[in-house]
Amino acid sequence: MSAGVRWKITWENDLEPSDHAELSEFFRATYGPTGAFNAKPFETGRSWAGARPERRAIAYDSKGIASHMGLLRRFIKVGDTDLLVAELGLYGVRPDLEGLGIPHSIRALAPALQELAVPFAFGTVRHAMRNHVERFCRDGISNIVTGVRVRSTLPDALPDMPSTRTEDVLVLVFPIGRPMSEWPSGSLIERNGCEL
């Protein structure tokens, strides 16, 4: 991100309706090129797609919102172990800044993650993002955990659809209060809620 970027780390309750409207427009513009389905949750002015974030890191520059990442504390189950994490998600970076956002978003959120006193932060990305996140992992801030599937509830319970989905995604783990060696082993992560 350029030097002209300012970060706003905010609690969800502190966002105004105008903030949600601006974020909704940002997500439609950011996610729309990846497929109309990806932008659909934001058509009604919502600034979240599944689970609603607890805190947000929002980068602004002279053109408006440059980048966004949300976080939500939750218990997940990794194998047989219940684990408190800060889930990171709802990530977006304006198309003209692609490739510059994730490391800056994590660094901006670092004080909030420390304040929340979670042992780990975790997030998931599509396999198509592997090269991008591998570059990011070289800094040692994050680790890619492979061979793990993630099971989540769907945002809407429909009578003719399953209530959960299991995905083969890349899992990123960020050691916050504990070393990576303490991340539990397991081939399935139960999110026990909607993806952020």
UniProtKB/Swiss-Prot annotation:
InterPro entries linked: NodA, Nodulation_prot_NodA_CS
**One Pfam family it belongs to:** NodA
One Gene Ontology cellular component annotation held by this UniProt entry: cytosol
What PROSITE patterns does UniProt report for this protein, alphabetically? Answer: NODA
Q: Which GO terms describe its molecular function?
A: acyltransferase activity
* Compartments reported by the entry: Cytoplasm
Name the top EC class. Answer: transferase
Iron found in the keyword field: no
UniProt-listed Enzyme Commission number(s): 2.3.1.-
Provide the alphabetized UniProt keywords.
Acyltransferase, Cytoplasm, Nodulation, Plasmid, Transferase
What coarse category fits the chief subcellular location reported for this protein?
Answer: cytoplasm
Q: Which domain of life is it from?
A: Bacteria
NCBIfam families reported for this sequence: nodulat_NodA, PRK00756.1
Query: What is known about what this protein does?
Result: N-acyltransferase required for nodulation. Acts in the production of a small, heat-stable compound (Nod) that stimulates mitosis in various plant protoplasts.
Q: State the family it belongs to.
A: Belongs to the NodA family.
This chain belongs to which protein, by name?
Answer: Nodulation protein A
Q: Which organism is it from?
A: Rhizobium leguminosarum bv. trifolii
